[in-house]
Curated annotation (Swiss-Prot):
GO terms for cellular component: cytoplasm; membrane. Substrate binds at W22, S82, L83, F143, F144, N145, I146, Q147, H237. Gene3D superfamilies: alpha/beta hydrolase. HAMAP family: Carboxylester (MF_01260). It is an enzyme of class 3 (hydrolase). One of its GO terms (molecular function) is pimelyl-[acyl-carrier protein] methyl ester esterase activity. The physiological role of BioH is to remove the methyl group introduced by BioC when the pimeloyl moiety is complete. It allows to synthesize pimeloyl-ACP via the fatty acid synthetic pathway through the hydrolysis of the ester bonds of pimeloyl-ACP esters. Belongs to the AB hydrolase superfamily. Carboxylesterase BioH family. This is Pimeloyl-[acyl-carrier protein] methyl ester esterase. One of its GO terms (biological process) is biotin biosynthetic process. The gene is bioH.
């Protein structure tokens, strides 16, 4: 199998491992790399089937968890956005000794709506899966549009996402479909209690994919003393794109507090 590509930028003593979301690749972090690489060593992951790992055909949630955990430096800090946040959460549960911090961005331990749990309606995810097969490009564009509903910078941010998606070789239908299955089926809420490392969760107050009303529920599920939640006003599902400087300031402050 082709070696797993892993981009490293910066030379700080603290290692940050970045995991992107559905449909995109590690270029999604370009806005903040310029800032954070002055302070930390950044490890930028392309998930299997995406970006530079487009030929790496490994789609199971458990295998992706294993690949990233094994490749990560010891005592690094995981940063995961959306689908990447779900993967980062699982890594910190399965490999509790390897990491010293967890930063979750606009993500949920269960993306699908359940009883007493806010999330995406199952029929919407099913519909996306169906449309993906029949109209690949428009379905991806539609998903990007949903991520920025209500934000003032709507058009600029959507354009950035589309540029990242179409700049490199497109992920296959199988890659995107497998990612949607993870979003639809994975539920690790009951395992949050096993996370015993400092955790920061960043949300956008306008996010319709991961609504801020999950915050008090997650607080009860992950009852650990260093568990910080921050809501960025006027931000939606990708706050690091709409508010890069504030986002980096939050991350630097969090790491400084416990490092």
């Amino acid at each position: 199998m082709k070696p797993f590509f892993w981009r490293i930028i910066g030379s700080g003593s603290v290692n940050l491992v970045f995991i992107h979301g559905w449909g995109l690749n590690s270029c999604i972090w370009n806005n903040i790399i310029i800032i954070l690489s002055n302070y930390f060593k950044l490890h930028l992951v392309d998930l299997p089937g995406y970006g530079k790992n487009i030929l790496y055909k490994e789609y199971s949630f458990s295998k992706i968890t294993e690949i990233i955990a094994c490749k990560s430096p010891k005592k690094s800090i995981l940063i995961g956005w959306s689908l990447g946040g779900l993967i980062a959460t699982n890594i910190s549960i399965v490999y509790p000794e390897k990491f010293k911090g967890l930063i979750i961005v606009s993500s949920s331990p269960c993306f699908c709506e359940k009883k007493d749990w806010p999330g995406i309606k199952k029929e919407i995810l099913n519909n996306f899966s169906f449309q993906l097969k029949n109209d690949f490009h428009n379905t991806v564009k539609k998903f990007f549009n949903i991520q920025f509903l209500g934000t003032k910078k709507n058009n600029n941010e959507i354009k950035k996402l589309k540029n990242i998606f179409f700049r490199q070789k497109e992920p296959s239908y199988k890659t995107l479909s497998s990612g949607l299955k993870i979003l639809k089926n994975i539920d690790i809420r009951n395992y949050l209690k096993y996370i015993k490392i400092p955790t920061l969760r960043i949300y956008g107050n306008l996010d319709v994919i991961v609504p801020v009303k999950i915050i008090p529920i997650i607080k009860k599920l992950q009852n650990f003393n260093i568990n910080k939640n921050i809501i960025i006003p006027s931000a939606s599902h990708a706050p690091f794109l709409s508010h890069p400087f504030l986002f980096c300031k939050i991350i630097k402050y969090f790491i400084k507090k416990f490092n």
